[in-house]
Design a protein with these regions (language model features):
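Canonical Rossmann dinucleotide-binding motif of NAD(H)/NADP(H)-dependent dehydrogenases/reductases
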Residues: 1-29
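Conserved glycine-rich Rossmann-like NAD(P)H-binding loop of the short-chain dehydrogenase/reductase
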Residues: 25-40
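A glycine-rich helix->loop->beta "capping" turn
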Residues: 50-51, 71-83, 90-91, 117-120
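Conserved Rossmann-fold cofactor-binding substructure of NAD(P)-dependent oxidoreductases
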Residues: 60-76
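Hydrophobic positions on the long internal alpha-helix
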Residues: 68, 82, 108-118, 177-181
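Catalytic loop of short-chain dehydrogenase/reductase
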Residues: 89-91, 118-194, 199-207
């Protein structure tokens, strides 16, 4: 009998804490850009009784994301989703931050939403940085939430001349994460599936 599957992006300590809490009896697929990171985390968890498979997954690459989701489906129905992947403003360029933290997260939410089982749950790690920036207009928030994924990086507000530095790029990415989770929660099915953003708020309904 196949187990329910947890898709977990970003092999770090926050993701592991969540996976340990919800992963008993589940097949856990952990993806990270650096396979050795995923392998290290999988080893730690497997040694204490979890069932974890490490894979390489690049959050900036849609093909890699699709392969990650497909790999999870080979083990069973995807019932849970953890997105703890991303880069920080001290690690990466403006372009990379927007490609990974903003675009990649939007793709991952969209693709997991297409296949997650009824009653499935998901969590995306965000940041207070999304609120530590100048106020966006309602129209700008709506664009971050609802623009087709492949058009997100073409938005005027995300063009190089409108992004001051890596911190600003990170703030915009995290603001987009929040709005995208709200948008995808509706598509996932508010009364049957549940998505939340950390820290702070949650959207959807646990019933």
């Amino acid at each position: 009998m196949k187990k329910d599957v947890i898709l977990w992006a970003g092999a770090g300590q926050i993701g592991m804490a969540i996976a340990r809490r919800i992963g008993t009896g589940k097949k856990i697929i952990v993806g990270d850009k650096k396979l050795e990171n995923a392998e290290s985390i999988a080893k730690i968890m497997n040694e204490v009784g979890f069932d974890v498979v490490p894979v390489q997954m690049d959050l900036s690459d849609k093909t890699s994301i699709l392969k990650f989701v497909e790999t999870g489906q080979t083990y069973g129905e995807v019932a849970m989703f953890i997105n703890a992947a991303g880069v920080s403003p001290s690690q990466a360029s403006v372009e990379t931050i927007l490609k990974v933290d903003l675009y990649g997260t939007a793709v991952l939410l969209e693709e997991v939403g297409k296949i997650i089982k009824e009653g499935g749950v998901g969590v995306t790690i965000s940041s207070q940085s999304g609120h530590r920036m100048p106020q966006l207009t309602a129209e700008e928030d709506e664009m971050l939430a609802c623009t087709p994924t492949e058009e997100l990086l073409s938005l005027e507000m995300l063009q190089p001349e409108n992004i001051k530095d890596t911190l600003h790029a990170y703030q915009m990415a995290k603001r987009c994460n929040e709005k995208r989770v709200m948008y995808e929660a509706v598509k996932w099915g508010i009364l049957q599936k549940y998505v939340c953003k950390m820290p702070g708020r949650q959207t959807g309904n646990s019933r």
